[in-house]
Amino acid sequence: MSDHQVEQLLHTTEGWFSAAYLSLQTLAERGTLPDGGSDIYTMFSAAMIQPLSLRRQAFLAMLGLADEFTEEMAQAVTEYADAASQIADLTARNAFVTRLPDGVTYRFHHMMKECAQRTFRTLPPESQQRCRRRYGQWYEERGQYLQALRAYGGAEDFDGVLRVVEKDAGILLALLPPEQVLSWLDRCLPEVLERHPLAMLVLMRSMFNWRRIPEMLRLKEQLLAAIDARPDMSGEERGNLRGECDLIMSFLLYNDIAGMSRLHRSASAQMSRPAVSIRRQGGWTFGSPSVLMMFHRQAGRLDCELAEMDECMPHYYCVTNGHGQGAEHIMRGEAAFLRGQLDDARIALAGAYAQIRDNGQENMALCCDHLAWRLSLCTGETPRQDFDQRRRELLFQHNAAWLNILNSTDAYYHALIGETESIPEVFREHRLASVRYLAPGKPMMELIENQVYLAQGAYAEVIGRSQQLLAVCDAMHYALVAMHVQLQTAGACEMLGRRAEARGLLEQVLQDAAADGLVMPVVENYRYLAPLLADMPQRGDVPHMIELGRRYEARCASVRQRSAVPMAFHVLTPRERDIAMLVAARLSNREIAEKLYLSEGSVKQYVNRIYAKLFIEGDTRTKRKRLVEMTQH
């Protein structure tokens, strides 16, 4: 091979050619290839890192802590004034250091990264801590709080950890394992913790989210003691901290709307500023896609709960700068939907969307989306964005919690219409254990997973899970979630021919539903309950439920038919499929643009991308003819 070919192979294989070379070198030296017990990383370090100067080795070791880095970052975290030339030399000589397409960011191949980290662990402990602290400062200054927390934690710099906890207000902190945060607190000196009362408030709320109530109460006592131990603290700041403590403690009365509101009013009376530990851009529903599922706690009290919500939310908004704004409108819209009052639901939904527009509260927008998708199966109105569009939009926000909520809505919708292959993988393959859900929102995820099991025909699984799920709902006063689980279980029993059990469950649900005028939970499960409902006494809302159920199933069938696309179109996104079908129906670009509210230029770009994905070539007439043929197959 020529030198050029060797270099090309090296870069094309992202360095794996070097790994093959190292194996062959072992064969030449020892007469055997490395076996399964050989450490390729030790071989790599011996060949690629140890021959370097100690200064270059230290440079690589420190950069090994970063997933990606720029020249500016490299200089900051290594304190090498010549970092740019060091990187340029490494990139030119080594395929294991790659410049990314943006032209400014670099990345180590994972073999180089692993070996660099091993080398880092050989540096003096104080050097390691200083380097990690520099990483923490770099990430903190750029708002990359998750990375900053890990860096400061690794450096045992708990002032840094607590400072970032305060700035983050628990938003990204929720993505860390609680055990890691508790480990930091165990190693943090009390006097360091007491220097950061606002961080203590954030940690109290995080402990509630993780259901670590004893730790939450212990932090409260430490906070109050720290306030009392500061005679120099102004009365105003004492009031702010004590008021915010009341605000956080209100979560212990979670979903007791009136009880929570009493503490919100106490907080409002003491505070002269909005809460620092709760930010508008943070989550409000603990990952639940539904507000009503969180706060409907007792059959027959729905109207009281709606009135309490209307009364209490303004007090909460006052002390949190509008956190969760629109929640009462969403809850009222959901209640109207469940009562079959579709126009009222649409009006409330439009009001909620208008209230939260451009205020940065993505959690509430996602709750609106959840209601919009459920409504669409009754009204035929298409939500503002399809799931793929919404997912792409959320990806730019780098918040896994928002994607989890979207996935739950996506899963529930496709389970309702019976399109199980379109359900997001985490629900379709039942991998919820791999996702870190906050405790108050987890029962809603379990409910949705149950709906997926039902759609997949896994009836025994639904029945087997029900007792544990209902026990959790009872403990958390989740009356609406329990109603859905009972209906799912009744449907599963009916499908397995266990009519007596199904009937007993359905009779209980009908009694509870009648107390609040709820019909849609039954309608959403009509596919499984139809024979049983027909056999029930035709009184109360049962005839109305049957009528709505028939219409609902007809609309679901229509949605399934519309979404049925040729096999070849499965490589296209949903939007591309829609456009491809319109092109095949011989609509012009202008007509498609008007129908889908796009510009003609956008339609043209979509069409070109469709042809490229489907490998359709030729002039315009030939391409359209081929597309029509594909739809007919």
Per-region residue spans from a language model:
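Internal alpha-solenoid helical repeat scaffolds
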Residues: 192-367
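Linker/hinge segments immediately adjacent to helix-turn-helix/homeobox DNA-binding domains
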Residues: 27-41, 446-468, 472-474, 478-482, ...
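Amphipathic alpha-helical segments of tetratricopeptide repeats
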Residues: 149, 169-170, 186-190, 221-233, ...
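Amphipathic alpha-helical "lid/sensor" segments that cap RecA-like P-loop NTPase cores
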Residues: 2-42, 54-58, 64-68, 79-80
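Recognition helix of helix-turn-helix DNA-binding domains
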Residues: 586-625
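Extended alpha-helical scaffolding segments used for macromolecular assembly and cargo binding
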Residues: 126-198, 206, 215, 219
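C-terminal boundary/linker of central alpha/beta nucleotide-binding cores
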Residues: 41-121, 130-133
